[in-house]
Amino acid sequence: STNATYYIPFVSGTGYQANYIDSTNLTYNPYTNAISCNTFAGSSTSALYADLAEVYGADANYEVGTLVALGGYYEITTTTTPYQSSTIGVISGKPAHIMNAGYTADYPVIVGLTGRLPVKFIGQVRKGDLITSSELPGVACKLDPIHFVPGCIIGKSLEDKFTEIEGMVEIIVGRY
């Protein structure tokens, strides 16, 4: 049901409390006994997805997997140069947690700042290789240590890719 009032019982030690849940933010499937919620304020011990993300104002709406950097007219834009030190993350499609969720902008985008994310990628890569920005806007590539620039590394590859064509590669976003 999507238009109902729910009271969910919570038990803590010897106490019992029924809390009202706003149905505009909640769906309940009685067949699977699953509760889904768009926004949750509280404590969670696990998450279905694997990246920590934040909302930023961008120059446009970007596709999931686009590599982004500080700059442009607002706060962020796509990466535009190889080994770009202002790179901050990857556009996320299914973040585990979104910080700054109430932020408003003409083009609010969700940027994965750490964790596992798919990224647009050009060239070959092996699991564990360091990842940076390429010459293609918003597309990552394997780092060539000869061209290293401080701050240019966005993460490490979690998988192998043996083709030169552009595709998606799962990476661990983080500072290395």
Region roles according to the model:
Residues 4-6, 10-25, 39-176:
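Extracellular receptor-binding modules and their adjoining Ser/Thr/Gly/Asp/Asn-rich linkers
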